[in-house]
Amino acid sequence: MGAGFAPAKSDQTCDRLQKEMKRPLYLLLTLCALTLRAGETARTTNMSSTNRTELATLGGGCFWCVEAVYERLPGVKAVTSGYAGGHTPNPTYQEVCTGDTGHAEVTQIEFDPTQISYEQLLAVFWEAHDPTTLNRQGGDTGTQYRSVIFYGNDAQKAAAEKSKQAAAKKFPKPIVTEIVPLTKFYKAEGYHQGYYRNNQNAPYCRAVIRPKLEKLDKATKH
């Protein structure tokens, strides 16, 4: 998202850089349907799911960006940034940034399947990042930025594989997104939660996240 270097991510260890993906958006009807549904615009980060909700765990680069995308969708009840897929228990952000923990930055989404389906969340996932770049999103490089879908059950696994096959027809390069079981999700530090919502005028938010959201918004208006 955005050309060139993005501003540094406050005083934390990992700089964020993104380039706007120069490819046409697809699945516009799905996105239009989502925006037409009534829903809340501000979400909490309480990830206690109920018997009416389900969880999806997705990694598509910087979790600030992915979180901001899903917080705005009707049917999404809560979004939490965190880490998954590695071997280090209770990792810190600084540890994950080294690339040595095996963890990816991920977003865990609590959603009401009667309002938005898992398949629709996946449709947005393919639009919100470039799944053809290995261990990289724009200028963010490292295994912690890998494209990954962590499934919670066999139904999610099947849906993810089917969605990936369909999405592959839309990209000129092979999709490198991993589809793996979720073993443990670690919630990220508090300052990561609702980052865009709470820091919309921060340099990274203005240079990277806002253009990404505007791009998705334009897709729903055509």
List each model region and its residues.
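Flexible coil/turn and secondary-structure edge motifs
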Residues: 22, 36-222
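Sec-dependent signal peptide recognition
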Residues: 22-29
